[in-house]
UniProtKB/Swiss-Prot annotation:
One MF annotation (Gene Ontology) recorded for this entry: L-lactate dehydrogenase activity
UniProt cross-link Glycyl lysine isopeptide (Lys-Gly) (interchain with G-Cter in SUMO2), position: 57
UniProt keyword annotation of Phosphoprotein present: yes
Annotated gene: LDHA
Similarity annotation: Belongs to the LDH/MDH superfamily. LDH family.
Function per UniProt: Interconverts simultaneously and stereospecifically pyruvate and lactate with concomitant interconversion of NADH and NAD(+).
Positions where Phosphothreonine occurs in the chain: 309, 322
Domain of life from the UniProt record: Eukaryota
Organism (species): Oryctolagus cuniculus
Residue numbers binding NAD(+): 29-57, 99, 138
GO cellular component, one term: cytoplasm
Annotated catalytic residues: 193 (proton acceptor)
The protein's name in its UniProt record: L-lactate dehydrogenase A chain
Length: 332
């Protein structure tokens, strides 16, 4: 008696399954899973692979997502401790690493995470030599440099999530003050993701109307409205969320899916993300910092040359020096 499947279905074609739009997420902690669900909800991949060292947690997360398949449009969700499950990925998102503790600076995490990357990156490269690498783990600017060094990839294919979230937080808070949706509030935070990020006050606008032109004290200590506080809130926000709920997830997950969409759909949108800045803004070392970048199917194809004040440029240079001071001490 023929099996039920054979009675029901007549096969016409022996297919070899090679995914066309595969995305891998390395690390199934709170951030990794927020990235995964955000990507699934945006229908960006035909296959999603999850990788972690904690096998039970990994299998549980995979099964939980698979059970939602009816409500998703990603036909294959796989997982494994072995990196062979990641083969043929277009995009590999790295969220694995030691988690930032309450009150711990992002830079303090660094050597702990370098050691983790020494295992992850060669395995990713082995199975997906043509992928784009999107680094999310903190401190993101330094770890993007680490991923670039270990992978041997050209710099366009190694991207740090950088200030994409900082800028999104900034635009949200700007919108709250002005009573306008964040999408219509334009403002950029550049430089280091974290404590020494640089708000570009001159670029803040709604409908092309410059806030700095209307309110020349914007971002200065003399400002009666204290817009500087908005940037301070951005810097403090991750620490506050970590203090309140233990970690940050949803905003970073949505932010990463936003970047993944630009890459997978070759949108060529401009994002404030971490890229190799040597030779720009007076920076002479191999450091990764966030500037507005054109993001598409080849990763970062172009960088927008932002007009910075001498103070802003000095701030960026100081961040670069701080990062380089740490990078040159790293043990690979």
């Amino acid at each position: 008696m023929a099996a039920l499947k054979d009675q029901l279905i007549h096969n016409l074609l022996k297919e070899e399954h090679v995914p066309q739009n595969k995305i891998t997420v390395v690390g199934v902690g709170a951030v990794g899973m927020a990235c995964a669900i955000s990507i699934l909800m945006k229908d960006l991949a035909d296959e999603l692979a999850l990788v972690d060292v904690m096998e039970d947690k990994l299998k549980g997360e995979m099964m939980d997502l698979q059970h939602g398949s009816l409500f998703l449009r990603t036909p294959k969700i796989v997982s494994g401790k072995d990196y062979s499950v990641t083969a043929n990925s277009k995009l590999v998102i790295i969220t694995a690493g030691a988690r930032q503790q309450e009150g711990e600076s992002r830079l303090n995490l660094v050597q702990r995470n370098v050691n983790i990357f020494k295992f992850i990156i060669p395995n990713v490269v082995k199975y997906s030599p043509h992928c784009k690498l999107l680094v999310v783990s903190n401190p993101v600017d330094i770890l993007t440099y680490v991923a670039w060094k270990i992978s041997g990839f050209p710099k366009n294919r190694v991207i740090g999530s950088g200030c994409n979230l900082d800028s999104a937080r900034f635009r949200y808070l700007m919108g709250e003050r002005l009573g306008v949706h964040a999408l219509s509030c334009h403002g950029w935070i550049l430089g280091e993701h974290g404590d020494s990020s640089v708000p570009v006050w001159s670029g803040m606008n709604v409908a092309g109307v410059s806030l700095k032109t209307l309110h020349p004290e914007l971002g200065t200590d003399a400002d009666k409205e204290q817009w500087k506080q908005v940037h301070k809130q951005v810097v403090d926000s991750a620490y506050e969320v970590i203090k309140l709920k233990g970690y940050t997830t949803w905003a970073i997950g949505l932010s990463v899916a936003d970047l993944a969409e630009s890459i997978m759909k070759n949108l060529r949108r401009v994002h404030p993300i971490s890229t190799m800045l040597k030779g720009l803004y007076g920076i002479k070392e191999d450091v990764f910092l966030s500037v507005p970048c054109v993001l598409g199917q080849n990763g970062i194809s172009d960088v927008v040359k932002v007009t910075l004040t001498s103070e802003e440029e000095a701030h960026l240079k100081k961040s670069a020096d701080t990062l380089w001071g740490i990078q040159k001490e790293l043990q690979f």
